[in-house]
């Protein structure tokens, strides 16, 4: 059965602790108008469309952390790990630039 982004976010919310994976701070409650902004795609949906609905590609973070994600070591580590995995699956060399 196909899953959409909203269903995926709900699954992640049920499975994970409700704290930012970047800072450890408590997240906004479900129902808050910014709730859906707490789901951060590590690899962008545009550049990595096959990872759009991949739970591994989504981190929980506060809305204000979303804009400064590159400042957090946890984000950098996850991004680099997923890039290696993505490019390894496609057998295309990845050049970090």
Language model regions located:
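Short Cys/His-rich metal-coordination motifs, predominantly Zn2+-binding knuckles/fingers
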Residues: 23-25, 64-65
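Short, charged surface segments at domain edges that flank catalytic/cofactor-binding sites
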Residues: 1-24, 49-52
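Polybasic, low-complexity binding patches
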Residues: 46-60, 64-97
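Alpha-helical structural elements
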Residues: 4, 8, 32, 81, ...
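Residue-level detector of short coil/turn "hinge" positions at structural boundaries
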Residues: 20, 27, 76-77
